[in-house]
Amino acid sequence: MSAALLPSPPRRIVVLAFDGVDAGIVQTMMAGGRLPNLTALKTRGGFSPLTPPVPPQTPVSWTSFSTGLDPGGHQIFDFLKRDPSDMTPTFAVAQDREVPFLLGRKTPAAAAAAVGTILLLPAAVLAGRGRRLAAAVLFLIAAGAAAAAFAAARAWLPATRPSIESNRRGTTFWSEAVARPATVMRMPVTFPPESFPRGRLLSGLGVPDLSGRIGKPAYYTSDPFFAPREGNDFSIEIVRLESNVGRQTTRIVGPPGRAFGRAGAIELPVTLSVSPSRDRLSIEAGGSRLTLSAGQWSDWTSLAFRVNPLITVHGYARFLLETIAPEIALYVSPVQFDPERLPPGFDISAPPGYAKELLRRFGRYKTMGWAIDTWSIQSGTLSEPAFLQDVAATVAQDRRMLRALVKEDRRLLVHYFEFPDRVAHVFWRFRDPKHPAYDAALAARYGDVVEKSYETMDAIVGETARALPPDAALLVLSDHGFATWRRSVNYDSWLVEKGYLVLRGNAQRQNLEALFSRGAFWEAVDWSKSRAYAMGLGDVYVNLRGREKDGIVAPGADYEKLRDELSRGLLELTDPKTGEHAVSRVFKRENVYRRYDPRLIPDLIVANRPGYRVSWQASLGVPTGSVFEDNRDVWSGDHCSLDPDLVRGVFFASRPFSSSQVPGITDATAALRALLSGKASPGPIVWR
């Protein structure tokens, strides 16, 4: 199915990458006339549904697109992975490591030498001119200053600092010679940023907030009866205020103290003052002062966390005063890193100064990879209107950047938008009357929000298409589609029920904070009797001898027999409430990945039918006792553990193409590389 490219390769290519756009919804909306710009793009070039990889998760799918490899090849196979030496879950995208801070243990001596040298030079000059007394005084001052510098550096500068190393393997298409010069904006799994010739990149999913988390918002409340939804599984910083009137002092949590050899987190004192009329709240945080009325957002506010006299970590956040009476409800966004004052060695762009350049051109923007806060609306600390306001502000800033970047004469521009995915995750409940969290009154107001986010996408596509010259090519794609999540399934509970996972006590509930702080997992498991365990979003592992720390299943025939047995049992798993099978397919890793690390990649990958998804506790490896339970959560739509064929994304192109079958996302990579190089496309997407 290969053919020569006709006409010649486009001089410029723009790729708009939208997260979580579902092929079925797009086709329905195009048929109804609600997506005129995508319809025009389809007419001009072409459209096809796009199948995500196994599993259809955001970091997995976008990394497959970025590299053209399947998850076994690029090794980003889930949000979470485990270390087989102790089964501790960690984030799969990147791993922590320690690197020297400045010169490491030599820093104090270097500081002393630098200070001493600066002062000794004039002393030497004075001595040479015969002014011995003045020279002697300066020599003494130099010695004292050098000693003070040594002591200060030793006391206040750490020998090492935390760093992050990407787990992604493979070569990205934008780093190849045919793509240069290239600009890449916010693509997932691009942190830490990698420099490439004539390239500019702003990192996306993977960049933490100032606390070192994927995103840690805060909620300040004077309501003594407030309780976050779902037991605060997403680890919102809940701060209890002593009063709903007058003046009081609290704090904002900043960077982790362990980065600087301290226990706990670095905190910034904050003073809150309620006006006598109880219609305004004044906030003092370091050198920043602002006053808000109920329902008002602040601008980005500078926050400086002083670690010691030598180190200050700079960031900024937005405040939202949801209510002031009868009780204070103050939301503080995750604290973003300030691109103008990043910590030493911490880069969020390539080249390192590009993030600062963007800030100076466009103003402050969200540097955190998961930019839109979906945790607070789930926890009941952010309302639906406030969430949509945050989405609108985030999208508006990204569109400002895109409008300017698309005018630059560069061979390739890749621009990623996350908002369709984030909106669908938390507003799906209003478009599914059968969902346990469906609310008819709220559905009348928010039932069309997902479709409206698609209309926003369509508008972005339209303004981009109009800004491009006729000889440019425009590609629009998404990493996966979406489905309702009505019922949660816990594979660890099923493994316990069937005797594959043996407990010696009750398993403790876990949350994101335990994940970040390396909490204790699996304490209730008796590994000497357990043959299998589950973790992540559909990953099942055999407790394999020679791989797992306490593995008991022999490699070879016993391993294969157990995998077959588990696969049959999971395919037969029936929800007693609905009578439906929860599992669509069970994949063996060798059947979906061309190559893989057998110590890293799950032995089985379980794919759900629409309506079902792995529960949050199951993703952390916690058997809760119930195999099935209603999902009454705000997070009501999903894709992560579903069958990829049932949650397809989209692929549009301004150039005509044909396809012999429904392409996968790596086929889109191959087609893009063909456009860039001018060589024949290997198919199934063939340029006409």
What are the language-model segments listed below?
Residues 353-365, 417-430:
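Short, solvent-exposed beta-strand-terminating loops
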Residues 7-11, 18, 33, 43-51, ...:
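Secreted, luminal/periplasmic, and some membrane-associated catalytic domains
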Residues 408, 517-525, 628-636:
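Conserved alpha/beta core surface patches that mediate binding of polyanionic ligands
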Residues 34-38:
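Active-site-surrounding "flap" and adjacent substrate/cofactor-binding loops of secreted or lumenal enzymes
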Residues 611-659, 668:
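Low-complexity, glycine/alanine/valine/leucine- and proline-rich hydrophobic stretches
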